Amino acid sequence: MKKGIYLSLICIVSLQASEKLEDITLNEQAPTNTKVVKNVSGEEVKSADLADALNRKIPSISLIRRSGIANDITLRGQKRDNINITIDGAKICGACVNRMDPPTSHVVTHAIDDIEIKEGPFDVEEFGTLSGSVKVTTKKPTKKISGEMSLNGGSFGYKKASGTISGGTDKVRLLLSASTEQGEQYEDGNGDNFSEQLANYTKGNPDTAKFNYAQNHKDMDAFTKTMYMGKVFVDITDDQELKLSYTANRSDDILYPSSKMDAEYDDSDMMNLKYSVKNLSSFSKKLEMQVYQSEVDHPMSTKYRALAKKGGKYMTHHLTTDMRGAKLKNSADAFGADISYGVDTSKRNWDGKYTVTTIDGSKPIKTIGKSIADVDTDNIGIFFKGKKSFGALDIEGGLRYDDTTIDTASNQEKDTDFTSSSASLFATYKADKDTKLFAGIGKSNRVPDARELYNVKYNTKEKPAKRVINGNPSLNQTTNYELDVGVEKYFPNGQLKFKTFYSKLKDYIYYNGSLKKNNFENIDANIYGLELSGTYLATDAIYLDAGLAYKKGRKDTLTTGQSDRDLADISPLKLHASVTYDYDMQGNVQLSFVAVDKWSDIDAQNGEQELAGYGVVNLKTSREFDNGLTLLFGVDNLLDKTYTTTNTYKDLILMTDSSDTMLINEPGRYVYLNATYMF
């Protein structure tokens, strides 16, 4: 149980292991600026939503609430493509221009083994890492026949069933995993569900009231989601391994009350193949090759809204995207250092169009026009990184060069291309056996995506519909110059870590909601902040854990026609704290607390609003039995608070008017029970 985790904290003091969350694992080689989240598929997470899980575990990550599932994250005040997210080394992108299907939504927590979060521009292996990277590793097949079955039920009609089985031989190992879940519209602390929150927002405003849910849809479920994953690992020889995997995600009828459309479905398919060979020569300790492909199909529409029923027709925005990539990487020992170098390439296609469909089928589907016109983003990059120790000093460094071309099928916008170089240096000094000092400096880049460059909206009040380009084909790529500094201290019964960062953003891509067209602009900006985290083993049975994050963001240059210098998405001071009590070797109780300060530094001209601070208490208890059964009971938001974590949506729903954006409240008191049987 947890006691083994607590005792390992004592070992950390002498072994100088890296920071771990949940299932603490000793790892001297992990860099100090890396966090690893373990046990994501276990007792810590009660739904498939990875974004919610990360928000609960990492103080520097905040949740962007959009729905009951498929939510998004910010990392150190940045979001969207500024965060590089990979799943088993493969990159998947959402198809929705409104971020209804962010990368975190295409992997479910049930399938995850661990997650590595690296903050800052220190990952040269990946294309476009600006504020940090999130690397998800899914479960691996085992030789021994093993598996688990899990049933979960909770408030607001939540139901989930999942299962995994694995086994094989000395040469071949297989894994099959599946899950299905559904949930009703959750209620906030006031007792209002999605439909009621939306009706409260639109009350007295006929221009927005037409986007309320229709009478026959106002009580529909918030989502259903199914996942299938299969893996085959083959040891060709003692030094050669082949890994194949396929994952399918199928989500249906996902409600997004703060947007004008809901997702009819969201389907994704990911295929991944890896081959590695060890000890090829003195120049190759390990050679790794990978090819992958991901596809996403995402139609969203006004089908469930009042204006569809009244007008007898609904609008659909159907988008697709696919990502193909390959990487070749070689690792070697040279000059007393661990080095690796390689090349990677990727091609993303993004396409979308608007159509109108009559509910009774009396007329053929009418195409209004393209939103994204078959845009290809091709990238090739080369990278080099190395790690070397000089006594008590460990140095890591990396270099990367990228060449990117972006081609659109539209004859009204121009193609574009970018080249960039990235570099980073990170040093860790062991001042004594209990103290680490660390500092890093880095530069990274990310190119604008097809939405930011070329996205088109249509004014359907005019006949024919008027084409308005929401994107900006003249955007430059963004460059991040960042400095990170910190200290980590170990004590006989615990650990304390402090770090601070300063990020200088040149040509930061920012949404200006005041403009009638070309809403994305380049500005210069800066973000700085600090993080404090610690663990303490009070007794053999009581364990305390806490983390705090603060950041501030300012515009160095202003957006066109605006005067507010506060950056959007800079969430306020956030505190996580928990105390866990092991009442015996097979059971524990945990009380946790999340507190967030008032959100007062806002970009009001782009839809942000002042939000009250809040404090939320969560309680859970788990019990393991000798027969392989584990029961987990919990209550989130124990005091049934009404609160909001997410501020602006104006850039997510592409609004270009002066109206306020609707804010979605978080769930009220949520009671859940999970039963897992492992064999």
Task: Tell me the role of every PLM-derived stretch.
Residues 225, 239-286, 295-321:
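Flexible loop and strand-edge segments within Gram-negative outer membrane beta-barrel domains
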Residues 388-395, 404, 495, 500-505, ...:
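Gram-negative outer-membrane beta-barrel transporters
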Residues 62-63, 91-119:
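Short acidic/polar hinge/loop motifs at secondary-structure boundaries
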Residues 261-282, 319-321, 371-377, 415-416, ...:
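Outer-membrane beta-barrel signature, preferentially recognizing the C-terminal barrel domain
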Residues 155-182, 193-252, 267-273, 277-278, ...:
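Transmembrane beta-barrel wall of Gram-negative outer-membrane proteins
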Residues 250-252, 294-299, 356, 362, ...:
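Surface-exposed extracellular loop regions of Gram-negative outer-membrane beta-barrel proteins
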Residues 21-50, 72, 80-83, 115:
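N-terminal periplasmic "start-of-domain" segments of outer-membrane beta-barrel proteins
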Residues 106-148, 678:
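A beta-strand signature from Gram-negative outer-membrane beta-barrel systems
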